């Protein structure tokens, strides 16, 4: 990733980078979406058959790992790891959550008030002297125009005047609201995150943003998100990957990942005191196709 990407993320609080995914990896990921979701033409042919995906703004979310390596690998794409490492200032990265999110127009109103994500990513609040220990990255897996419910993001220079707290729940949408900000706040300052499929949108968890209404009649939007911090803090996070380690998709993920890629899930690194003859043998039994040579 170019140096300007790190600088923009630090200074503006967000980054929009078109062409993040190559043509082949984008096509493979898009095809893998249909292992989890109906294609748009299938959904709109019979919305009632897929009603479970549109009971709320968030009902189209599926947590990783997923049924395809072509999707799973995007959560730890090498260029994403490069960006996170340089921005967070550490190679000791933790992937603390990963989600697929499908949104279909016509039933759910995806409009939100402005909010910051740290509220359910941390037990405390960002430290203003060093306010960026976490980032969220969202990869667009479909084209997103102004009618497709683009995320609206507020530059740090504008949003920093809004206090971190209170952070309240909007019972109508199930989304949070920063400091009671009304609908329409920052209408002249916010940016619509539009772009072609394959675009990367990364933002800090102290950056104000919101979801917006899908206005195209048969619009469908698909994204993959990955959230990163470093391993040191005890007060941040979203999921414990061990809770999902019996999932049928987990074994392939670990078996195909490199030691570097495994490490972002908390897998013991080569050279860790954890490894001995017994743990090597039993871990190999658990992941029979994994190359554990680097851990010997």
Question: Can you name each region flagged by the protein language model?
Answer:
Residues 1-11, 18-128:
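Non-heme Fe(II)-dependent double-stranded beta-helix
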Residues 200-202, 206-296:
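Non-heme Fe(II)/2-oxoglutarate
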Residues 67-73, 124, 181-191, 210-212:
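Active-site rim elements
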Residues 103, 154-161, 221, 227-233:
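Short edge-strand/loop segments of extracellular domains
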Residues 131, 144-208:
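Double-stranded beta-helix
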Residues 14, 95-97, 132-138, 148, ...:
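Extracellular structured ligand-interaction cores
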């Amino acid at each position: 990733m170019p140096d300007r990407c790190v600088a923009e993320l630090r200074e503006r609080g967000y980054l929009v980078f078109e062409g993040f995914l190559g043509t082949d990896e984008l096509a493979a990921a898009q095809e893998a979406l249909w292992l989890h979701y109906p294609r748009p033409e299938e959904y709109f042919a019979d919305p009632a058959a897929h009603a479970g995906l549109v009971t709320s703004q968030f009902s189209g979310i599926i947590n990783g790992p997923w049924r395809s390596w072509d999707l799973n690998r995007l959560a730890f794409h090498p260029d994403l790891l490069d960006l996170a490492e340089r921005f967070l200032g550490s190679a000791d990265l933790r992937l603390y959550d990963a989600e697929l999110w499908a949104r279909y127009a016509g039933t759910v109103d995806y409009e939100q008030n402005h909010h910051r994500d740290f509220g359910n990513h941390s037990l405390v609040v960002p430290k203003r002297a060093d306010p960026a220990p976490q980032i969220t990255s969202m990869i667009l897996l479909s084209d997103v125009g102004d009618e497709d419910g683009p995320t609206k993001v507020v530059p740090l220079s504008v949003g920093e005047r809004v206090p971190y707290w209170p952070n309240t729940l909007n019972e109508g949408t199930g989304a949070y609201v920063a400091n009671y900000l009304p609908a329409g706040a920052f209408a002249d300052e916010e940016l619509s995150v539009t772009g072609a499929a394959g675009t990367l949108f990364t933002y800090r968890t102290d950056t104000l943003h919101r979801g917006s209404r899908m206005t195209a009649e048969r619009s469908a939007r698909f994204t993959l998100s990955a959230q990163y911090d470093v391993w040191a803090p005890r007060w941040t996070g979203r999921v414990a990957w061990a809770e999902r380690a019996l999932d049928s998709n987990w074994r392939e993920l670990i078996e195909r990942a490199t030691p570097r890629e495994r490490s972002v899930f908390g897998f013991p690194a080569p050279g860790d005191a954890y490894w001995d003859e017994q743990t090597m043998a039993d871990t190999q039994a658990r992941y029979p196709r994994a190359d554990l040579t680097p851990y010997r």
